[in-house]
A protein has these predicted regions:
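ER/Golgi luminal nucleotide-sugar-dependent glycosyltransferases, focusing on the catalytic module
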Residues: 1-302
Length: 302
């Protein structure tokens, strides 16, 4: 994996890095379109699968100064991201934004999923400005994901929890804390590059990522999708969400994700309430949450 020689990696030009992974050739135009909202002052890093080297000329036309990395079709968008991080962490960027050509072929709503994330992260120059300003004003902000896509691992751990715990142990972190933390589904976000340094220092090898085709859950890429959030929290950073209007908010701990099956603890028992109250019997919990549903929806703890 080597960067295209036309893009020098010896020094950065700006303080913000945009990292794009292109796997689906029919979607790269969407990335080019939303990237226009980034404006000036951005260094571009683009990873493409080895099968798409024919796109390099087109990418070069759109982003003449981009650093382009051809990668093996392994690790989805996660391994290419780590490969870029290895190379740019010494450059001390203040901020990065990461997106990719997500399709989610196993779902009928994959297009709306992708476009919703793009719109909330890069949908307008105003949104971009508000995202960057949020990091300037809050030194504890570590990761900023699209509103509605920042989830609670407590309910959306899937089949990856053992791998998340193993990663925590590998990095010398407390694996007992991996039960509940926020993470960004889809691995598209704004973030502070330095929070990923412990992961890069762990030297995860490409061979540790399984080859394609991957199952829908339970692999190292799925675990790292969640682990990024845990890594941020464990280092004292926060994980927040941004709306298409650029409003910054804390993630909703009981949010139901429209792009995944509803977890059993959050199953809708009636149109007015969500059920998860492990300290009492289920019958009591249903009635309790029926009464308190409006408060929970507002994020008010009782």
């Amino acid at each position: 994996m080597d960067f295209d020689t036309m893009g020098s990696l010896e020094a950065k030009t700006n303080n913000v890095a945009a990292i794009f992974h292109i796997f689906y050739p029919d979607l790269y135009e969407e990335i080019f379109e939303v990237a226009q909202n980034l404006g000036e002052g951005i260094d571009y890093y683009v990873t493409v699968s080895e099968e798409l080297t024919g796109l390099i000329g087109t990418i070069r036309q759109r982003f003449p100064k981009a650093k382009i990395l051809t990668v093996e079709n392994r690790g989805r968008d996660i391994l290419p991201f780590l490969e870029v991080l290895k190379r740019i962490l010494p450059l001390d960027y203040e901020l990065l934004v990461k997106i990719h050509t997500k399709k989610s072929l196993h779902r009928d709503d994959g297009t709306s999923w992708r476009k919703d994330v793009y719109e909330k992260l890069l949908g307008s120059s105003e949104t971009v400005a508000k995202a960057r300003k949020a990091f300037q004003q809050d030194s504890a902000l570590g990761i900023l994901g699209a509103q509605g896509h920042v989830l609670n691992n407590r309910f959306y751990k899937g089949g990856s929890q053992n791998l998340v715990q193993a990663l925590a142990k590998q990095l010398g972190l407390n694996a007992n804390k991996t039960a509940e933390f926020p993470f960004v589904a889809s691995t598209m976000f704004w973030a502070r590059p330095e929070l990923f340094k412990p992961l890069i220092d762990a030297r995860i090898e490409a061979a540790e990522f399984p080859g394609e085709p991957l199952p829908q859950d339970g692999t190292l890429p799925h675990a790292l999708e969640r682990f990024f959030g845990f890594l941020a929290i464990e280092q004292g950073f926060s994980v927040k969400a941004i709306s298409k209007e650029g409003t910054i908010s804390d993630p909703e701990p009981l949010a139901i994700y429209r792009y995944a099956p509803v977890p059993k603890p959050l199953a809708i028992r009636n149109v007015r309430s969500l059920v998860y109250y492990p300290a009492y019997s289920e019958a009591y919990a249903i009635e309790h949450l029926r009464v308190t549903a409006l408060y929970q929806a507002a994020g008010i703890e009782l």
